[in-house]
């Protein structure tokens, strides 16, 4: 678990994932391509694109193409993503969105997600959340979990 405290930044540059993500990958001794499932806080569509880029799942500036190419679709994409519907479709519980990210990641690792979206052989998952005011002052946390 890596938590990065608030820091001044410009929304044109990056999200807090640019700090918490690399630290989490280093501590877990894995890289973004090893992740089988990602549960990422999605308060707005731009938030998702920025965090996918800053976590290293795609190149900076290529988040839109990464998503539109179908990479986030469970069963067919390179990085199944927010299979619970995410905050934009299912579970935006005000300031408690981070925990829902961990819950769905654990369901995937245990093989307990809905059968239509269960990621086959999911043994490594990432949960990431950002809070505060994206683009000015915010904090982020990245958790990488492995099935035993």
Q: Where do the PLM segments sit?
A:
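Single conserved hydrophobic/aromatic residue that forms the stacking wall/gate
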Residues: 1-11
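Beta-strand segments within the central parallel beta-sheet cores of soluble alpha/beta enzyme folds
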Residues: 5, 32-40, 61-69, 79-82, ...
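Hydrophobic alpha-helical scaffolding
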Residues: 14, 38, 92-95
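Short, well-ordered amphipathic alpha-helical segments that serve as non-catalytic structural scaffolds
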Residues: 14-28, 104-111
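Conserved beta-ketoacyl condensing-enzyme motif
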Residues: 34-54
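Conserved beta-strand-centric core segments of catalytic alpha/beta enzyme folds
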Residues: 47-51, 82-148
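Membrane-interfacial loop-to-helix junctions in multi-pass transporters
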Residues: 72-75
């Amino acid at each position: 678990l890596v938590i990065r405290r608030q820091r001044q930044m410009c929304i044109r540059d990056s999200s807090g994932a640019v700090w918490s993500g690399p630290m989490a990958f280093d501590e877990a001794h894995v890289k973004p391509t090893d992740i089988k499932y990602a549960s990422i806080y999605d308060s707005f569509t731009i938030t998702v694109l920025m965090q996918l880029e800053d976590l290293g799942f795609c190149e900076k500036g290529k988040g839109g193409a990464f998503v539109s190419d179908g990479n986030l679709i469970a069963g067919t994409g390179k990085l199944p993503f927010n299979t619970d519907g995410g905050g934009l479709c299912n579970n935006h519980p005000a300031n408690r969105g981070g925990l829902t990210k961990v819950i769905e990641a654990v369901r995937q690792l245990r093989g307990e997600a809905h059968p239509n979206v269960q990621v086959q052989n999911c043994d490594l998952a990432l949960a990431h959340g950002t809070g505060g005011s994206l683009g000015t002052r915010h904090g982020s946390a990245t958790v990488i979990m492995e099935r035993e």
